[in-house]
Amino acid sequence: IHYIKRAALSLCAAMSLGLSATSQVSQSVTNTQNAQAEPLTPPYSETFADESFLESYTIIDSNQDRTKWEPYLGSAQISYNSELDMDDWLITPALNLEGGKMYSFSIEIMTGGSFNETFEVMFGKDETPEALVNPIIEKTSIAHTVYKAYTGTISPAESGTFYVGIHGCSQKDMLSLSVKNLKIGAA
């Protein structure tokens, strides 16, 4: 645990001491946890046009570099780190999916420059990177500064609650990935 000590003199010259602690844990760090009561049934869409997605999405900074998915100009964006490869997740609210059915998936993505950025889209039964093991869009490297649509399908083997995760996984010292207009069609 890393402690930060803060001291300040009051007007009466008395000393006050404040203590705050931050934890440096070696596991995934969740900034926002999914808060809706019931899983959503597709069709489902999210534009990321404003900050409201932060209320229902789970954001995980797996490499703990303090760079994470954030609202940016009508999108969700993840930026680079000059020392660590990107390893950051943007995970949907819980979705109620039927086994044996196919759901269409699409998302618009662009990069912040001409650097190759890498992403993948996965789904699974929990909102953790370890559970998001089923590919919707395989790991893909892109470099374009206009939004382009990427598509895939979600085909769960069994019925239940599932999550979809957009994984920013670019090499270190690139620039940024921005996403908008995520859509999951009805079965």
Predicted regions: what is each one?
Residues 104-138:
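Extracellular ligand-binding interfaces
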Residues 85-89, 169-186:
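Extracellular carbohydrate recognition
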Residues 48, 92, 101-111, 119-121, ...:
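Extracellular beta-strand-rich recognition modules
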Residues 77-88, 140-144:
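Extracellular beta-rich ligand/substrate-recognition surface
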Residues 37-83:
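Extracellular glycan-recognition surfaces and repeat-rich motifs
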Residues 128-158:
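Extracellular carbohydrate recognition and processing domains
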Residues 148-177:
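Extracellular beta-strand ligand-recognition surfaces/modules
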Residues 84-100, 149-150:
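Short beta-strands within extracellular/lumenal beta-sheet-rich domains
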